[in-house]
Each structure stands twice: as structure tokens, then as C-alpha cells.
């Protein structure tokens, strides 16, 4: 019976694929559980059912997903809200189709167990990514006159272990897990979301031009992607197996234990309120706060329009 159902599924998918719109999708990083919903949507045939022939192409470390959208390599991408807002401000107008992370995953991983609150960061040497993604921590530093000495890194683990810094920025679904898996036990861990600096991060984006030209196609891709994430939420073990397939295909150095832990954190950060089903919508209040603070500190030259960024759907 299972073989018959599998055969029927393949026949249906083949029929859909024959008339499908070809699409290239690029997540903002290498294969990992952060993008499990998109992998699941492809593997379970949700894109095919929507009449979409989707290829997933991961970016190179030195060439991000927004660049792939700009040069036409990709039709749909994921990126963080801050990067989408700054790109829009610089002339690359993006439209948010799905908001998959409602809270910031930024954390401060500290050596000293006495670093328990914001004021304890004053005058400390703290690592941050050379590639960026540190706008809000920098704003926090300025707004509270902490006088943090920022030290740029490529890999936070080595500089942290060396003792050259007092703490490092990291992601709760990534660096925090990697530190633990490497046997590094921090003295303390502070979440920016608990320090008054919470905001949405990952979302699904498309160029405004593509959105206006293909509104129905964009709707189908977003709905199929959401269906993929909903399946992942209810089938976590199987979802990690799918993630590991992409990990192996793209030769990413990780393991199933890291990806299991990562998936749990990613799914929790999708919830507007802990324990409730995700809305997958961009919260207007959080957006306007981010808009204001980024404008105030020079990361935007003008306010980003919420209705335009969300394609007028909110």
C-alpha cells in the first residue's frame, strides 16, 4: 500500500512539474535547520502541488542572498528584517512574503558569571561578526553609554577561548549550540530580547519588481513555504532527517545533534507568544520600533514604508 501511495505521489508531482513555473530560492546561509520549512516544502511536494518547480541554491559565504536576488540568480530569498530594510533604503526594494522569526536570536556569551545585566557590559571587550549583523548591539551600546570595545571576528569560538574578549555576540540557534557542543561552558548568557531590544529577524523576501509582476506566483510560493514550516513543527524528527540530506549534499560540516537543537530554537523563535502557533506575519509595532531606532542611529536615510515592504497585505 505504501509503495502504491508513493508511486501515485510521484505521478502527481510529475504532472505538476511538467507545467510548473521554474523558481530559484536561496536561503541566506548554508544548509541547516534554520531553513527546514523550505526543504520540507520541496521534499514533500508542496511547491510542486502549487505548480512550482523550485531549485534551492545556497549562497557562498562571501556573496549573500540579497546579492543573488539583485543579480537575478535567485527569485526568492531569506534574509533578516534589518538587512531587508537597509537594502530597501539603498534602492533594492524587497517585499516580505512570510515572517518566520518573530524575535531576535542574538545573545551575548560571556566568560564572567557576574555579567548578568546590561550595565555589566560597560567597558568590556566584546566580539562581533566582521560581516556585520551587529547593528542593534551597537545601538544598545550607544544608547546606554556602555563604552564597549568591539572586536571583529570571523570565527567567535577561537577568539573566545583565547581569552582575548570578555564576551561575544552569537545566535541562540547557532553559536550558543556550537560552544556547548565544543565543551565550552560560558559564565553567563544574555539575550538581547530580554534587554529591551527585541525585533523580528528571518523572513521570506522577493524583489518589489518581481512581486508586482507575479503576485499570484508569490502568494503560492509563500503559502507552500508556510505549509512546509507547519509540517516541520509537527514532524520534527523527520524534518531533521530532511535537513541532514541537504547538509550532506552541500558538504556542510555539522551533525544531527546540532541540527536537532537548532531546530527547536528556531521553532520557538517563530512564535509570537511562547507556546502559541506562529502567525508568520511581520508585526507592525516591532517594525516601527526598528524603523525608528535605525533611522535615529544612521542605519537608514529615510523611514521604510511598512505597507510597501509587506506588499500592502498587512
Which residues does each PLM region occupy?
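Sec-dependent N-terminal signal peptides
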Residues: 4-16
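N-terminal hydrophobic or amphipathic helices and topogenic motifs
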Residues: 19-51, 284-314
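Short, glycine-/small- and polar/acidic-enriched structural segments
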Residues: 21-153, 157-170, 192, 198
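Pocket-lining segment of extracytoplasmic ligand-binding domains
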Residues: 82-83, 155-252
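Short, surface-exposed acidic
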Residues: 147-150, 187-189, 249-264, 301-308
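Secondary-structure end/capping motifs
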Residues: 214-297
